[in-house]
């Protein structure tokens, strides 16, 4: 069978998932049909693998791969670690000292042991209601830095993160990757960590290349993945900074309409 692409690579929030952060029925049917045709399903997200495992379980894609924490980890559906790039522990401890207004910003970390945050914000759970993935409130001044995938800051508004971003880039810009995964979520990973880099590492063990992938995304943490794939598609409601960074890429519909699934059905000739 002559397939237009060997792999479908997609971001989750704002892209593959509905605005309620759930997997739509059309999306489930589409990804199952693609896997039956031999197309690899690769989900690339800022989320933790515990989150993504639950989503993949609902999709039912048996051979799917998870690129998580913006590329800091790659796992198969069985949870086997295929690639890892952690922040150095001593660097993490310095990141914990980042100054910010605690009334407007919260600090978080994804580590091998789970999700940690400096304050209890129940609204954050809405992003994880499908998986039940939950946070632990800690005092970061006393918390360890082992096995850290990323440290990230969530503001009430994008403006709340301006000073945090300036501080991080000035102090850690040379040794980390700093990127927005959403308008008010600023994330810090180890140097050269991105979804695109993780995809490159994954494909070293596959019989096809980046040009054989179609990718979908909506945030600044998708730039490399979308730019390097054979076909990159940006969501209609994507971060305007992404559209400006990748003006050559096609803009498709919104996640509300399950536009990734609809686009894939057209590309691969799947009936409704």
Swiss-Prot record:
Keyword Mitochondrion belongs to the record: no
PROSITE patterns assigned to the protein according to its UniProt record, in alphabetical order: COF_1, COF_2
Protein's name in the database: Putative phosphatase HI_0597
Catalytic residue positions: 11
Record-listed Mg(2+) binding positions: 11, 13, 218
First-level EC class: hydrolase
Entry keywords, A to Z: Hydrolase, Magnesium, Metal-binding
Cofactor: Mg(2+)
UniProt-listed InterPro entries: Cof, HAD-like_sf, HAD-SF_hydro_IIB, HAD_sf
The organism's place on the tree of life at top rank: Bacteria
Organism: Haemophilus influenzae (strain ATCC 51907 / DSM 11121 / KW20 / Rd)
NCBIfam families recorded: Cof-subfamily (TIGR00099), HAD-SF-IIB (TIGR01484)
A family per Pfam: Hydrolase_3
Family under the similarity heading: Belongs to the HAD-like hydrolase superfamily. Cof family.
GO molecular function, one term: phosphatase activity
Entry annotated with the keyword Metal-binding: yes
Enzyme Commission number(s) from the entry: 3.1.3.-
Binding residues annotated for phosphate, in chain numbering: 12, 45-46, 195, 221
């Amino acid at each position: 069978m002559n397939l237009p692409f060997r792999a479908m690579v997609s971001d989750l929030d704002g892209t593959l998932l509905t605005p309620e952060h759930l997997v739509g029925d059309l999306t489930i049917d589409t990804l199952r049909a693609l896997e039956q045709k031999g197309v690899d399903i690769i989900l690339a997200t800022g989320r933790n693998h515990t989150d993504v495992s639950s989503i993949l379980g609902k999709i039912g894609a048996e051979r799917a791969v998870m690129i998580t924490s913006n590329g800091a980890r790659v796992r198969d559906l069985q949870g086997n670690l295929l690639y890892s790039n952690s922040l150095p522990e001593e660097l993490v401890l310095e990141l914990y000292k980042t100054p910010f207004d605690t009334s407007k910003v919260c600090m978080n970390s994804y580590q091998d042991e789970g999700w940690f945050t400096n304050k209890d914000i129940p609204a954050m759970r809405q992003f994880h209601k499908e998986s039940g993935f939950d946070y632990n409130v800690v005092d970061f001044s006393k918390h360890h830095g082992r096995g850290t995938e990323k440290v990230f800051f969530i503001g009430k508004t994008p403006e709340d993160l301006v000073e945090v971003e300036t501080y991080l880039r000035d102090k850690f810009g040379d040794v980390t990757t700093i990127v927005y995964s959403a308008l008010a979520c600023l994330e810090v990973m180890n140097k050269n960590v991105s979804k695109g880099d993780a995809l490159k590492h994954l494909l070293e063990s596959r019989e096809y290349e980046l040009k054989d992938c179609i990718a979908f995304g909506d945030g600044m943490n998708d730039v490399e993945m979308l730019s390097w794939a054979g076909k990159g598609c940006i969501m209609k409601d994507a971060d305007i900074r992404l559209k400006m960074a990748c003006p050559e890429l096609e803009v498709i519909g919104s996640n509300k309409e399950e536009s990734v699934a609809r686009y894939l059905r057209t590309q691969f000739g799947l009936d409704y």
